[in-house]
């Protein structure tokens, strides 16, 4: 059986069963919420936001002047 199909069947079975049998789902959600509010998760989120900002600035501003000079020199050498 395909792993994705098995996971889908498992999740549907959890939704159908009694609340008492699926009680671990609430524990899983509460642990997830605690992890998302942890210092490590906040640090990772902060780093990801910083990297995204740096990427956007890099793409919007274009290459640094040294790279432009190197590309110009390369293009001039190809012209003969």
Swiss-Prot record:
Residues 1-22 form the signal peptide. The keyword Signal applies. It comes from the Eukaryota. Keywords: Secreted, Signal. GO terms for cellular component: extracellular region. Its main location: secreted. Expressed by the venom gland. It is found in: Secreted. Belongs to the non-disulfide-bridged peptide (NDBP) superfamily. Long chain multifunctional peptide (group 2) family. This is Venom protein HGE029. The lineage of its organism: Eukaryota, Metazoa, Ecdysozoa, Arthropoda, Chelicerata.
């Amino acid at each position: 059986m395909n792993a994705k199909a098995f996971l889908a069947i498992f999740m549907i079975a959890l939704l159908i069963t009694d609340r008492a049998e699926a009680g671990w789902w609430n524990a899983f959600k509460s642990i997830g919420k605690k992890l998302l509010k942890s210092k490590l998760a906040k640090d990772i989120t902060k780093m990801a936001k910083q990297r995204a900002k740096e990427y956007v600035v890099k793409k919007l501003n274009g290459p640094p002047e040294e790279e432009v000079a190197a590309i110009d020199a390369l293009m001039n050498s190809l012209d003969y």
